[in-house]
UniProtKB/Swiss-Prot annotation:
GO molecular function: DNA binding
Location in or out of the cell: Nucleus
Pathway, per record: Protein modification; protein ubiquitination
Gene that encodes it: ddb1
Main location: nucleus
Protein's UniProt keywords contain Metal-binding: no
Lineage of the organism: Eukaryota, Fungi, Dikarya, Ascomycota, Taphrinomycotina
Keyword Nucleotide-binding: no
Disulfide bonds: none
Matches recorded under InterPro entries: Beta-prop_RSE1/DDB1/CPSF1_1st, Cleavage/polyA-sp_fac_asu_C, Quinoprotein_ADH-like_sf, RSE1/DDB1/CFT1/CPSF1, WD40/YVTN_repeat-like_dom_sf
Protein name as catalogued: DNA damage-binding protein 1
Family in the record: Belongs to the DDB1 family.
Species of origin: Schizosaccharomyces pombe (strain 972 / ATCC 24843)
Any Pfam family the entry gives: CPSF_A
Described function: Component of an E3 ubiquitin-protein ligase that includes cul4. Required for ubiquitination and the subsequent degradation of the DNA replication licensing factor cdt1 and of the ribonucleotide reductase inhibitor spd1. Also required for transcription-coupled nucleotide excision repair.
């Protein structure tokens, strides 16, 4: 049975509402992400997540309203199935609760509105208006009588809805107007000649009728409506802003900025502290504007002022204290500070970022020695980025101290139960800091000095501080400072217990007890690094590319072991792993490698050497004291953490990529467990013990469409939108951009011809060349009828060079490698090319039904996904491309991937997914040529790309085997796996019990939500929803017990509650 869960949940925000939802004294922001509502509190100039609610439907709009006698606002949610319901905050249970359960306003005989579903609330809280179908409005009256509100049980906040007809069919936008006598609305629409008009209506709730009003305006620009508190309405067009009302003649303002179109807008609520005459608007290019309207008795003057640039907005929410929330589909959503919004000096400041990786047009899995990373082509237009998603350790900054030039630092606990001393080592000085139990910092002048500090620890039972600088060894007992001054410069040092070891210039290693010398050892070359372990063993790295092991005891110092390396050791750390008699020696080299030698009983375990390349420059190794694991920091171009988990080495990235050095730091009063520094600051931080997904953003010129990679570079196909301010014309330019993996910087690019759009890219088998497919999209053509196949290779001086070019008759929509051949989907055909001796030639081709969208291959099959006609199975036999099977159902495919032999996974534009089977053993030829539908279900999002890959390797006892990874338009990454024959019955029963025991929001059915949705029918779902099953882990014990026992007419499961928790924990290991 197919098992689907989220690796990364949807992050695109298309709708948001600002209201007093949780209590009457504080503000909340509620955002909608596909089928999830997130409730945030607005406190201390930040948005903090309170809770989230998974809705078993796709949310198309959400609005707030305040029922009579309710101290808080309720929200009404409209879904894509033309239904609505309401939610409110239950103060007794501190949770989101159902108000009115699902109400259906669908009419199958009517045509859907071209403007999409519109949900509107009357400013005076009298009615809610829903526009779904052409020529029809659904009116939902809000209770205004307290007596009727108290006696109503079925609909505690709203009356039954009724429908009214309007003449306008092609509606552009609708707005509820400020009219105190009757609920009124303005309708912006197009007539049959595409001329834009505005009409107004008044709603008669008692008679359930709608009457035309006398405020009309003809032949205006198409745009967005914003109601004014003066009773009129603003129309934001492409060139003009109009004001239309009954009292003032039509006024218009010529826009002074080259704006293509206004998208979202917001009228500022007086309670937010902003002038009610000021409106914040955004255009499709991501620019924010302040629009101000000043009214006199008969006229209105309008001003438009640019504020700055932000993410391309899907929704705007004005907040108190000149703050603005920008919800975005194309980039990160942000909380902005708009200082002095009523004055002329504006500066946008980002206060908070909400990561969004939507829309994902393509992605790859990049596997290296540090683990797997997902690299996505995200965003669009100016907001295009590459997003690198890693399963990494998160580091949360608690406090930042601005300081530059830090070389190293140390922390020690001196006669305290916390780390009360911090040493900051700069290039030519050391600053010592004392930290009080309350977290107050003060300087210690006794330990501060005019040279760098190399090492700090405590000796003699924590009674003295040991400080090794470049000139001396110092001991401090809290009052007096004792020192041993070196005749030569000290290059490195270490200690264990009361024993101290330093290396000085000339390759001499000195041993001390305290500051009393007890022995010395002369090396052949200079010492690059050393580490004193608890077995009285010193590991010494030499500039001659050697490591020697010196044993220190009362009888003297002896050389017990040596290792010959190929590179110079630069940093050494020894960590216990096997118990008292063994451990691992970590050695970083000058070229970015980390070597690991396993030792036991003082000897290297044979064949235990492991080499991991973590960069190209020297790496600093630092031991980190953790209660959970013995961890080693590797600080280089990409800071990473190394530790063993279940006898398996784990190398995981860190969320902070600017980290230069670290130190363990335990201080309960500050709530931190580490210090780290960057080029510009020191951070007191808290490192999580649990890995989670972290997203790194790489800026791209333009927006990325396709990506592939080899061991050194990312090859990214980008498109860049250029505008001419004078003519307002736009044109798309295409590029191949090459990014170096370690630095993530662009090192080369190739510009394609005008009107040439990049469509596909693959890496060839030699791991050096890439093949790019394009199509020419000329303005006078509906579809491309020409394109090119090109082969590129990186030169020795890191330039990109075209090696071959082949012109084709159409757009190269998709490319894959099939053995040593190149398979291309070109318009309505599949072609096989061969690249030999710098030329590309056609081996064979075949026609497909309409338009090839995607191709997947295995050893003997080529699967072509069609725009309208599902998939076709092809084989390449004796230089002939032949069709062996086809799905004859109409299906608008978006991606295809081979699940297993003769089993194919297909996604379609409506959010459905189908698994198809090919029967190649049937005696009937017609059966062998016809693909059979095996499983079908609804995913809820449009899938752009599906790949056969695994982000996290499953464990041996995993209940589900991951098979595919799907990327969606709304920024989610879905894992598609197989639950196996033995696990399927239990998981299906568990899913059914959860559906029956846990009440859904709005009374929606999860079973209906996951049903396959065809043209005129729905079919039962063949799916185990991992998100539903995993969501119950945090529920109370009685509810889990009810699920196990089959409450509400469910099936009793043959497991305990503890077994249920273990099952869910097992399933959660598929993703962070």
């Amino acid at each position: 049975m197919t098992y689907v869960t989220y690796l990364h949940k949807p992050s695109s925000i298309r709708n948001a509402v600002f209201c007093k939802f949780v209590n009457a004294s504080s503000w909340n922001v509620i955002v909608a992400k596909v089928n999830c509502l997130e409730v945030y509190s607005y406190e201390n100039n930040r948005l903090c997540l309170i809770t989230s609610a998974n809705i078993f439907a796709k949310i198309v709009n959400v609005k707030a309203f305040k029922p009579v006698s309710s101290p808080t606002d309720h929200i009404i949610v409209a879904t894509d199935s033309f239904r609505y319901f309401t939610l409110f905050w239950d103060a007794n249970d501190n949770t989101v609760s159902n108000g009115i359960k699902i109400q259906d306003c669908s009419e199958r005989s009517l045509r859907e509105s071209q403007s999409g579903p519109l949900l509107l609330v009357d400013p005076f809280q009298r009615v809610i208006c829903l526009h779904v179908y052409q020529g029809l409005l659904t009116i939902i009256p809000i209770f205004k009588s307290k007596k009727r509100f108290m006696t109503s049980h079925n609909n505690p906040s709203l009356h039954d809805n009724f429908s009214v007809r309007i003449q306008e069919l092609n509606v552009v936008d609708i707005a509820m107007l400020y009219n105190s006598s009757r609920p009124s609305l303005a309708v912006l629409y197009k007539d049959s000649k595409s001329i834009v008009h505005l009409s107004t209506y008044k709603i008669n709730v008692r008679e359930q009728e709608i009457d035309e009003d006398d405020v009309v305006c003809h032949d205006i620009e198409e745009g967005k409506l914003i109601p004014s508190e003066n009773g009129g309405v603003f129309v934001f067009g492409e060139m003009y802003v109009y004001y239309i009302s009954k009292d003032i003649q039509v006024s218009k303002l010529l826009l002074t900025y080259p704006i293509t179109a206004f998208s979202p807008s917001i009228s500022n609520d007086p309670e937010t502290g902003l002038d009610s005459s000021i409106y914040i608007v955004a255009d499709e290019s991501g620019m924010l504007y302040k629009f101000k309207a000043l009214f006199t008795d008969e006229t209105v003057s309008m001003e438009l002022e640019k504020l700055g640039e932000s993410s391309i907005a899907s929704c705007l929410i004005a907040l108190p204290d000149n703050h603005l929330f920008v919800g975005s589909h194309f980039n990160n959503s942000v909380l902005l500070q708009l200082p002095s919004i009523t004055k002329n000096n504006h500066k946008l400041e980002i206060l908070q970022n909400f990561v969004n990786i939507a829309p994902i047009s393509d992605f790859i899995i990049d596997d290296d020695q540090t683990g797997s990373s997902i690299i996505t082509c995200s965003g669009a237009y100016k907001d295009g980025t590459l997003r690198i998603i890693r399963n990494s350790i998160n580091i949360e900054n608690v406090a930042l101290i601005e300081m530059e030039g830090i070389k190293d630092f140390f922390s020690v606990s001196f006669r305290a139960n916390y780390d009360n001393y911090i040493f900051l080592s700069l290039i030519c000085e050391t600053r010592a800091i004392i930290v009080s139990p309350e977290g107050v910092f003060s300087a210690n002048h006794d330990l501060s000095c005019e040279e760098s500090t190399i090492f700090v620890s405590t000796i003699y039972g924590n009674s003295q501080i040991l400080q090794i600088t470049t000139k001396e060894i110092r001991l401090f007992d809290g009052k007096k400072l004792h020192s041993w001054i070196s005749p030569m410069s000290i290059t490195c040092g270490s200690s264990f217990a009361d024993n101290v070891c330093v290396a000085v210039a000339g390759g001499l290693i000195l041993f001390f007890e305290g500051i009393t010398e007890v022995g010395r050892y002369q090396c052949d070359t200079e010492v690059s690094s050393l580490c004193f372990t608890e077995e009285n063993v010193v590991y010494v790295g030499l500039w001659s590319a050697d490591i020697i092991m010196l044993t220190y005891c009362q009888d003297g110092i002896s050389l017990t072991h040596s290792l010959k390396l190929t590179d110079i050791p630069r940093s050494i750390v020894y960590s216990q792993k096997y118990g008292d008699d063994g451990g691992t020696l970590y050695v970083s080299t000058n070229n970015g490698y980390v070597l690991m030698f396993n030792f036991q009983n003082g000897q290297v375990i044979e064949h235990s050497l492991r080499r991991n390349q973590l960069g190209v420059a020297p790496i600093i190794l630092k031991h980190f004291d953790s209660k959970e694991k013995n961890a080693i920091f590797a600080l280089g171009e990409k800071p990473q953490l190394m530790y063993y988990e279940s006898d398996k080495l784990v190398i995981t990235p860190l969320s902070c990529t600017e980290m230069l050095n670290i130190s363990s730091y335990v201080n309960p009063s500050l709530g931190v467990n580490m210090l780290y520094c960057t080029n510009s600051y020191i951070s007191l931080a808290k490192m999580s013990e649990i890995r989670s997904l972290n997203v790194q953003t790489v800026s791209v010129k333009g927006f990325p469409r396709r990506i592939c990679s080899n061991s050194l570079f990312y090859f990214v196909l980008c498109m860049q939108l250029e505008e001419s301010i004078g003519t307002q014309e736009q044109r798309l330019l295409s590029f191949l951009r090459v990014y170096e993996k370690n630095t993530l910087s662009e090192i080369a690019h190739h510009k394609f011809n005008e009107y040439e759009m990049v469509e596909s890219i693959i890496l060839m088998n030699d791991d050096k060349r890439v093949v790019v497919g394009t199509g020419f999209n000329f303005p006078d053509q509906d579809a491309p009828d020409s394109g090119r196949l090109m082969v590129f290779e990186m030169t020795s001086d890191n330039n990109i060079e075209m090696q071959a070019e082949h012109k084709v008759q159409g757009s190269v929509n998709t490319l894959v490698l099939y053995k040593h051949l190149i398979v291309a989907g070109i318009n309505a055909s599949v072609c096989i090319f061969e690249y030999e001796h710098g030329t590309m030639h056609v081996r064979n081709s075949i026609r497909t039904p309409t338009y090839t969208i995607d191709i997947s291959v295995n050893q003997d099959e080529i699967i072509a996904a069609d725009l309208m006609k599902s998939i076709t199975v092809l084989q390449f036999i004796d230089d002939q491309l032949i069709e062996v099977a086809r799905d004859y159902h109409p299906l608008w495919a978006t991606s295809v991937e081979i699940l297993s032999e003769r089993k194919y996974f297909v996604t379609e534009a409506d959010g459905n997914a189908v698994i198809l089977l090919r029967d190649n053993v049937s005696p009937q030829l017609s059966d062998r040529k016809k693909l059979r539908w095996y499983k079908k279900f609804y995913l809820g999002e449009l899938i752009n790309k599906t790949r056969h890959c695994t982000f996290i390797e499953p464990q041996d006892k995993s209940l589900v085997t991951p098979q595919l990874l799907c990327a969606t338009v709304d920024g989610s990454l879905m894992i598609v796996g197989d639950a196996g024959m033995s696990n399927t019955p239990l998981l299906l029963q568990l899913q059914d019990n959860i559906r029956k025991v846990i009440p859904s929001f709005g009374g929606l059915s999860h079973k209906e939500w996951k049903e396959y949705r065809g043209e005129n029918e729905t079919s039962p779902s063949d799916l185990i929803d991992g998100s539903l099953i995993e969501s119950i882990l945090g529920l109370r014990e009685p509810i889990l017990n009810e699920i196990v026992n089959g409450g509400h007419e469910g099936t009793k499961l043959d497991i305990s509650v503890q077994d249920l928790k273990s099952i869910i924990e097992n399933l959660e290991k598929l993703h962070p």
